[in-house]
């Protein structure tokens, strides 16, 4: 278990990854490179041990990879196969990394489909939060709410690039790291009732 991974160490690991994967076209166009990158980020930057990671890859037919983190499942990640870039709207809120989901879904079909699909998976699996990514951009949001707001009308934590994630790493760490999920910080950031979190995992 990588529970002892510190914020400083995790940020340093992401900096190394950004330096090593500076060829964006390679990340976008080579599926195995992209999946290896996501694997590294999950383990080295967010402290998830291999024993807490379940991966199902549907590369031929559906064009995405599902990661389930935690036992029971706390995070579901949909990693798109296609070498696409998510078009992102300008941030309208004070926090530049928080964007409302309806605006995200208006920007392009691929992102809308990814958001809708991972939200459905997350709700069915009882995940605390879900992530849609193409390997270099990350959209993080809550698949369910108990405050009366439909989940797809809420807000998402958005990192427009790996460099943007590095610049705002504390925010990413609190949202989807192993220790961040244990402390339920994503709910504070995205404004959901804390009772919607799944049972504590080992």
Where are these regions (language model features)?
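A short, conserved, highly charged catalytic patch centered on acidic carboxylates
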Residues: 1-129, 137-202
């Amino acid at each position: 278990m990588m529970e002892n991974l510190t914020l400083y160490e995790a940020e340093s690991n992401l900096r190394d990854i950004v330096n090593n994967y500076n060829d964006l076209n390679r990340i976008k166009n080579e599926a195995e490179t992209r999946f290896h990158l996501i694997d590294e980020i999950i383990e080295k930057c967010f402290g998830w041990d291999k024993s807490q990671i379940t991966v199902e890859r549907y590369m031929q037919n559906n064009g995405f990879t599902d990661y389930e983190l935690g036992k029971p499942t706390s995070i579901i990640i949909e990693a798109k196969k296609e070498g696409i870039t998510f078009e992102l709207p300008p941030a309208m809120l004070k926090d530049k990394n928080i964007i409302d989901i309806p605006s995200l879904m208006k920007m392009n079909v691929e992102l809308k489909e990814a958001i809708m699909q991972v939200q459905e998976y997350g709700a069915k699996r009882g995940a605390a939060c879900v992530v849609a990514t193409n390997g270099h951009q990350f959209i993080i949001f809550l698949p369910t709410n108990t405050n009366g707001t439909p989940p797809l009308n809420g807000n998402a934590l958005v990192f427009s690039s790996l460099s943007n994630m590095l610049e705002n790493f504390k925010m990413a760490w609190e949202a989807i790291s192993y220790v961040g999920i244990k402390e339920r910080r994503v709910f504070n950031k995205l404004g959901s009732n804390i009772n919607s979190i799944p049972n504590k995992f080992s």
